[in-house]
Amino acid sequence: MRFLIGALLTLQTLVQASSMSSMPNYYPVPEAPAEGGFRSVVYFVNWAIYGRGHNPQDLKADQFTHILYAFANIRPSGEVYLSDTWADTDKHYPGDKWDEPGNNVYGCIKQMYLLKKNNRNLKTLLSIGGWTYSPNFKTPASTEEGRKKFADTSLKLMKDLGFDGIDIDWEYPEDEKQANDFVLLLKACREALDAYSAKHPNGKKFLLTIASPAGPQNYNKLKLAEMDKYLDFWNLMAYDFSGSWDKVSGHMSNVFPSTTKPESTPFSSDKAVKDYIKAGVPANKIVLGMPLYGRAFASTDGIGTSFNGVGGGSWENGVWDYKDMPQQGAQVTELEDIAASYSYDKNKRYLISYDTVKIAGKKAEYITKNGMGGGMWWESSSDKTGNESLVGTVVNGLGGTGKLEQRENELSYPESVYDNLKNGMPS
């Protein structure tokens, strides 16, 4: 995550300027210091364009340093492939031409590139896996051939589609062998990315990140220090601590454990962060994941008590978008000591654990106080706007957009199979 300095930085800047001079309509940002700056990371899911009506153009790009485009899938051979080509590469948005000559990319991928072009501090990464596709990691990760196929094909997608790196979301390695295989998979990816960077005209470093667990039953199986050698940063999934699978209602994204109702906080972000650091992961590489949704508990007498069912939801039962919160008739409780909040409707006996603006501010304080790498959110379609935005609240709490990490994205993809992307998406 470091830039070269002195003469090497000057040389790199000259090379970049020379390479980009032949490519039209770029909007460069000033060079930033090598150290300092928070990451602001968000997952954009390709299925959001359907019922949610959420498209890349809806992202408030100046508030983010990284967008993780989710999800690509994995074949048993290790081949990484797009999960929805209509959403990813085919859908025509307003302004896209049907009779444009050449082999061109459209869909969310084109829109992501245009976001990068107009926001030079915004990087995009292809996220591979996720909860649904995670069972597909085990087989290819177990062999050298499978790992090479994974690394080579994910790199090809990155080069073809104009990403700045790849993000791996394996939930979760189950034993010692799979943990070792994960390290070797990251090593293969890091080597492939660095080899491409070495021959790339601009010499930019391409990024490798993962979505990492916040539950000790999962991260204690991982080889954290060995993995860290290959990663640029970790997206700590500090949410889903409680839900439909539990016996009592609980907080789903608390920073600290509760001393008054310990049964309501089976996990905590703080324990995970401390354990990662103790294992050898630098604090400034840990990006704190936060939810833009809430988890519900029905027929309950309050936090930390039994429940029966989870009720409805915005898109799935028991899960409510933050923008749908709080529900009418519910009273909001904010517990600053554990950095958690929830709403409760005593008439309906319905409780939803979610982050409020005040709690988002407390999490920004926690990130700053502990020298962490920034914040991450799942997922972009669910936030509110204006002063009620959780993303905006955290970014402001970190010092505003001027305190975000400043690292210019990559726009040159000379090996892309898509003519319009290879040519810089000319107007």
Swiss-Prot record:
Q: Which SUPFAM superfamilies match?
A: (Trans)glycosidases, Chitinase insertion domain
Arranged from A to Z, the UniProt key words for this protein are: Carbohydrate metabolism, Chitin degradation, Chitin-binding, Glycoprotein, Glycosidase, Hydrolase, Polysaccharide degradation, Signal
Give the Enzyme Commission number.
Answer: 3.2.1.14
| Signal sequence, renumbered to the chain | 1-17
Catalytic EC class: hydrolase
GO biological process assignments: chitin catabolic process; polysaccharide catabolic process
Q: What is the effect of changing residue 13 to I?
A: In strain: IFM 50993
Mind naming one GO cellular-component term on file for this protein?
extracellular region
Q: Which residues constitute the catalytic centre?
A: 171
Q: Name one GO molecular function term.
A: endochitinase activity
InterPro entries, per this entry?
A: Chitinase_II/V-like_cat (IPR011583), Chitinase_insertion_sf (IPR029070), Glyco_hydro18_cat (IPR001223), Glyco_hydro_18_chit_AS (IPR001579), Glycoside_hydrolase_SF (IPR017853), Glycosyl_Hydrlase_18 (IPR050314)
Q: What is this protein called?
A: Endochitinase 1
This protein's species is Coccidioides posadasii (strain RMSCC 757 / Silveira)
Q: Which gene encodes it?
A: CTS1
